[in-house]
Amino acid sequence: MIENKIELNCALHTNKNLEFLCLDCKLIPCCTLCISRGGEHHRHGIDSLESIQTSSILSMMNNFKDVYPKVIERIENDQQILKDSDEIFNEIQSQYNKNKITINEEFKKIHNILSIIQLDIERQLTTDFQENTLINTTITSSINNNNNNNNNNNNNNNNNNNNNNNNNNNNNNNNNNNNNNNNNNNNNNNNNNNNNNNNNNNSITDILNISIKYIQQQYNNDDHFKIDSNSIELIKQYQQSLLLLNNNNNDNLNKLKEYNNQTIKFDNQLINDIKNNLKTIYSFENNNNNNNNNNNNNNNNNNYNDNDNNNNYNDNNNNYNSNKAEKLNIEIDENNYKFIKKRNKNYYIYSENNEFPKNKEGIAFGEDCGSLLEFNWNKNLKNVMLLDGFKESLEPGVLPNGIVHLEIGDIKTPLVVGSIPSTVISLTFNDGFNQSLEPGVLLNSILNLRIGDIKTPLVVGSIPSSVFSLALHDGFNQSLEPGIIPQNNKYKDFSSMQGVKYLTLHNIKSELNIGSIPKSVYQLTLRDGFSKTLKPGVIPRSVEIVTLQEITKPLIIGSIPYTVLTVQFLTGFNQLLTPGIIPEGVKVLEFYQVKDLLTPGSIPKSIYSLSFKDGFDQILSPGIITDGVCELYLRGIKQPLVLNSIPNSVTKLDIYNEFNQELTPGIIPNSIKELTLGSLNTQLVEGSIPKTIQKIILYGNIEPSSLDVCKLDKSVLIYKK
């Protein structure tokens, strides 16, 4: 019997009361909708709550007694899941903010590279235009100078012409005075007036005719001619005229040939290739915790073992031993297909004896792959790896067009002209490659080339001039005589994109001499135990960016040429930078996870932009950062800042990415006009930010309200990104 005053609403249908017990479902209470058509307990055995037997109630309560602890456990589990979810989401949110900052930083680097290239092109255009301007000025000055001399002579003759005529007439008058004085005086006056009116229009030829006539008259009267001032002027002009004619006009004609009218053209196909390559510069990786990863790996391994026979992936058919698997990083996907993960690309291992997934973008071919011709149908195939032992023919047309990335190991078949498709833009020769690379085997479509410890020497022409980025990896031991690494014949010419611009040298065994690094190289990276001495002149003056990481031989003065604009010291670089190592002329300087490298004078006064990032571990005592630095970037440094760490020359300051040093008043100088803050782990106080600041940009966990404690002027511009 149910008391009428007690509401017994159904949890599923809140507008209905519980009236029944389901006899088929552990006596779960139900309402009329629960047992109706479409309800969960339709056609189940039921018993009315109004007439329920005591035994049924006891049975239900005992069931509830067993169920309730599980409910409590479920609630606790749900609370734990909720807590874990919040923690994971907070990590995701934090990583999201870091990713946004990383994107901004990386694309800023790309923008800087493009800006530098643009400046180089504009500088080259300006230089060419200045040369053309000089040619024009030289020709104009030469011709105008000659014209001025002639004009001066003409003016002198015209100015003196009247006097000459007057003198001639006067002399005639004097000679005839004895015969008829009065008449001749009248005639002389008339002649003088006529000569004065007419001689202004006389040409040089007319003047000369008059002078010749006068001289002849004098010669007839007397053998001795008296040279007057007018004749002297004509004699001088005669000399200058001969000098003008003797001056070879070929100089100006040759100058005309020196004009250089250029039209800048861009390789749109190459630009499109670069744009497509830019899409491959990033990847998304799951940051799962270790336990989840271990569980997933164990599950994958169990699945693989259980289904080993069904998929024919047993050890007897596998040509890759454990060492090679470790070297190649062989993994197994959710369908038990093996693949090699390299440079964010998956290469699925193909064997003609085993099942293989269709339409994969990346395939690795080993010694049991059979003919590759059947893969011409796969239009999705973009990435190919030829593994050690590959022995199939590589005649032209075997590797299908459409391949973009190609990696070649210790294959047993030679490469010929046409073996590598013209669509390949990225090519890698892995350790052990032992085939000849004659000129023409590598086509001019290749932009990115990586070479490991290959066993055959390179010759001039082995590397095509189209290669834009070249990396020589650990163990490379082939000669690098001048010409092996191609260069553009025109110094620092980015317009044609010919010649290696980006060169990365790992722990190579080849010696570097002057000329080994071509003059086309724009950025040079030395890393991973690079152990060659950098004598002055080895790095050519074309290089504008030098990146150093884990090099073992000390730098000396002159190792880095004065023409370099940017120097980066990456994780693992551990050499003391004595004054002069970084030359005057460098504008941008970046330090990453390095420690105790700097002394006063290490940083030259030419530096405009300075960065300390990702675990930089040195106290920036006053004087380390030199006056002249205008932009300063601080990210995740491990030592506190002190007063006067930042000089007054700095006007732009960026502090971000886990910066956890105190910003006590005075640390940031009053010279700062623009301040960027992001992901700080430090508390701001009044005075942390000088009140002279003009602009603040906020990233990550920094909100505008967190600046209230600084009591900034309302005129300060604050941006949240």
Curated annotation (Swiss-Prot):
Task: Give yes or no: UniProt keyword tRNA processing.
Answer: no
Region annotation (Disordered) maps to 143-202, 285-322
Q: Which InterPro entries match?
A: FNIP, FNIP_repeat
Parts forming coiled coils? 242-329
Q: Which GO terms describe its biological process?
A: cheating during chimeric sorocarp development; regulation of cell differentiation
Record's keyword annotation contains Coiled coil: yes
Highest taxon in the source lineage: Eukaryota
Which regions are flagged for Low complexity bias?
Answer: 286-321
**Which PANTHER family does the protein's record reference?**
B BOX-TYPE DOMAIN-CONTAINING PROTEIN-RELATED (PTHR32031:SF47), FNIP REPEAT-CONTAINING PROTEIN-RELATED-RELATED (PTHR32031)
What this protein is called in its record is FNIP repeat-containing protein DDB_G0290617
Query: Which organism does this record belong to?
Result: Dictyostelium discoideum
